[in-house]
Design a protein with these regions (language model features):
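Periplasmic peptidoglycan-binding/tethering modules of Gram-negative envelope proteins
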Residues: 1-69, 108, 168-191
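Conserved phosphate/oxyanion-binding catalytic-loop motifs
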Residues: 72
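Periplasmic OmpA-like peptidoglycan-binding domain that tethers envelope proteins to the cell wall
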Residues: 75-191
Length: 191
């Protein structure tokens, strides 16, 4: 399945018929989705103001998909103690969840998880295209990163420091306590 997505197209007054080809990005619900541009204070869980647009986009997506629940995960690079990184990433995931709750998202739709350094990023096609020294399906483990040039190491570590979400359920609030569909489809009116 895919997440709901909405786009608008505005055209100036057109005097004749015209065909528009539109491509809509479809985010799969089976793979984690990276949330770009979420920034934290150094070595803290405090969200920086420049994260607002990305967080507000996440709120919009959750409002457009009212029946999903998500795991919100934060990740660190390998530097620092493993236990410390796990705690820091948990606090960061919780700070994102707190922001979402403060902006009207139901708490029971959100599960914060801090993975620390235990789930290094796997490189996908778009990232590999941006960084020619990475190949699709490379995994940014400590061992892999230490073989890179210093400037590449910093980029790889930055890619590991990320916030993602994945869909856990697609049936949130769809059924009553007896298992009946809350809003069944309306039957067509016969003439």
């Amino acid at each position: 399945g895919f997440l709901n997505h909405k786009e608008e197209i505005h055209v100036d007054s057109v005097k004749e018929s015209k065909v528009y080809d539109l491509q809509f990005p479809l985010a799969s619900i089976s793979a984690p989705v990276l949330i770009d541009n979420i920034f934290y204070a150094f070595d803290k869980a405090t969200l920086l103001p420049e994260s607002k647009n990305a967080l507000d986009s996440l709120i919009l997506m959750l409002n457009e998909n009212p029946n999903i629940t998500i795991e919100l995960s934060a990740h660190t690079d390998y530097r620092g103690a493993e236990a410390y990184n796990k705690t820091l990433s948990q606090k960061r995931a919780e700070s994102v969840v707190k922001y979402l709750i403060n902006h009207g998202i139901a708490p029971d739709r959100l599960t914060p998880v801090g993975y620390g350094e235990e789930k290094p990023k796997t490189i996908r096609r778009k990232v590999a295209e941006r960084y020619p020294w990475l190949k699709e399906n490379d995994v940014l483990t400590e061992e892999f990163i230490l073989k890179l040039k210093p400037e590449q190491q910093e980029t790889a570590n930055a890619l590991n420091r990320r916030t993602e979400f994945k869909v856990l359920r697609t049936t949130y609030n769809m059924f009553d306590k007896d298992g009946n569909l809350k809003n069944p489809p309306k039957k067509p009116v016969e003439n």
